[in-house]
């Protein structure tokens, strides 16, 4: 194809794409969804009276805040959540306001990536129990974990201790540091299931050596969903002069969190999972006493200004500020519902689906200790192959699940998951097993 033909093809494709987008925006379902999202700042939430009278009806009303079609069942918040209408509305309002280019201060827009963003850090700090000066707004836990792994002064032979159930976004930053700078990554092997907190603490304590500099672990592991005894692990680290860094990707929005009570040195999270904040909104918490021990990974103006505290870690240049509007709305929504209520719902739904799966012969990887479980259920179901059942569930039943090779199923139970949805999933699982037997 000559240059003129190529450019013509590109132009044609662009026109076709624009026409397709226009047709999509005219589609009644999509138009209706966005009209709903834009109709009001915060769609009316069910009240305490309904919750007291009929809990399931209360959650059914909250389910209407989400764009997930009524005939679909979503059991994969462990990967990514669905942002509800108040969050989508806030993101739209953020774009609607900022894209006018009408900021009163001429410097406001071009230095977006250099602002304190206190209007977003303040509510987050209150939500997780810290000061805003200890918070940097980053894109997700992976980015925060990379800042930690790259930013600490570690020497050849220094050891970082973690579990064998870390997400790649938590483990790989340390592996990169090991390959480049000669640190040593050591792992403790967690049993499946973890019987109790003491087992975890003993495994870590036995693995600590005089060269251990950092204990890094997932507050809730991505593999089995076990809630590790974070407060006790951080206390163990502190008692031995070791830094503690916690990957809390799953925690914010799933269960109550107070980083001060955990007494950790560093904490990261991905609120797009269980808080259902916009994708690309995350945070890095660094205890004030540790901030000056962490070097910037991404550098621009302000990186060497100690008075900025953790703010300097969020200075990356132009950023998606409307996503932060959405995260603020997600915090407000969680606060309006109540994290205690949300956590209780998460645990009840997960315990129910776990019992039902075990009745059907699944091998539970969830801890028998209720304190070490929340809203992720992992079971092993050999000889079922996860890739096959994932595809079958989605293509034939519109049910989204997640798992791991060869036969692990991981089920997430967000608060808007209804009992009738769980029953439908279980019926589909029974049908699949019968089909394969």
Predicted regions and their residues:
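Twin-arginine (Tat) signal peptide motif
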Residues: 1-7
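Pyridoxal 5′-phosphate
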Residues: 7-437
């Amino acid at each position: 194809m000559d240059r003129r033909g190529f450019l013509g093809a590109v132009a044609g494709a662009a026109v076709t794409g624009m026409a397709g987008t226009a047709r999509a925006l005219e589609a009644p379902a999509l138009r209706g969804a966005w009209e709903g999202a834009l109709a009001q700042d915060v769609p009316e939430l069910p009240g305490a009276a309904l919750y007291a009278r009929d809990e399931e009806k209360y959650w059914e009303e909250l389910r209407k805040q989400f764009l997930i079609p009524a005939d679909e069942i979503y059991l994969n918040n462990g990967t990514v959540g669905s942002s509800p209408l108040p969050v989508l509305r806030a993101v739209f309002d953020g774009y609607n306001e900022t894209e006018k280019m009408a900021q009163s201060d001429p410097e406001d827009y071009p230095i977006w990536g250099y602002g304190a963003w206190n209007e977003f850090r303040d509510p987050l700090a209150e939500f997780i129990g810290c000061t805003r000066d200890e918070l940097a707004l980053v894109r997700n836990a992976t980015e925060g974990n990379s800042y930690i792994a790259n930013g600490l002064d570690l020497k050849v032979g220094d050891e970082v201790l973690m579990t064998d159930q870390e997400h790649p976004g938590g483990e790989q930053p340390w592996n990169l540091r090991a390959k480049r700078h000669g640190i040593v990554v050591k792992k403790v092997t967690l049993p499946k299931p973890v019987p109790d907190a003491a087992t975890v603490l003993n495994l870590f304590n036995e693995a600590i050596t005089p060269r251990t500099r950092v204990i890094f672990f997932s507050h809730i592991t991505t593999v089995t969903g076990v809630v590790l005894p974070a407060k006790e692990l951080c206390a163990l680290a502190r008692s031995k002069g070791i830094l503690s860094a916690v990957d809390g990707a799953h925690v914010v929005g799933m269960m109550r969190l107070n980083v001060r009570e955990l007494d950790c040195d560093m904490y990261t999270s991905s609120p797009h999972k269980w808080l259902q904040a916009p994708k690309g909104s995350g945070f890095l918490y660094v205890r004030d006493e540790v901030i000056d021990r962490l070097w910037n990974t991404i550098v621009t103006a302000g990186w060497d200004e100690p008075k900025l505290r953790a703010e300097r870690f969020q200075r990356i240049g132009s950023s998606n500020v409307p996503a932060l509007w959405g995260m603020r709305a997600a915090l407000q929504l969680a606060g309006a519902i109540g994290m205690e209520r949300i956590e209780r719902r998460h645990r009840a739904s997960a315990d129910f689906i776990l019992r039902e799966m075990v009745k059907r012969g699944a091998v539970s990887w969830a801890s028998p200790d209720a304190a070490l479980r929340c809203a992720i259920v992992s079971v092993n179901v050999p000889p079922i192959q996860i890739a096959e059942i994932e595809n079958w569930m989605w293509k034939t039943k519109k049910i989204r699940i997640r798992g791991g090779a060869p036969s692990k199923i991981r089920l997430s139970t967000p608060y808007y998951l209804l009992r009738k949805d769980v029953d439908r999933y279980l019926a589909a699982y029974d049908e699949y097993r019968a089909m394969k037997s």
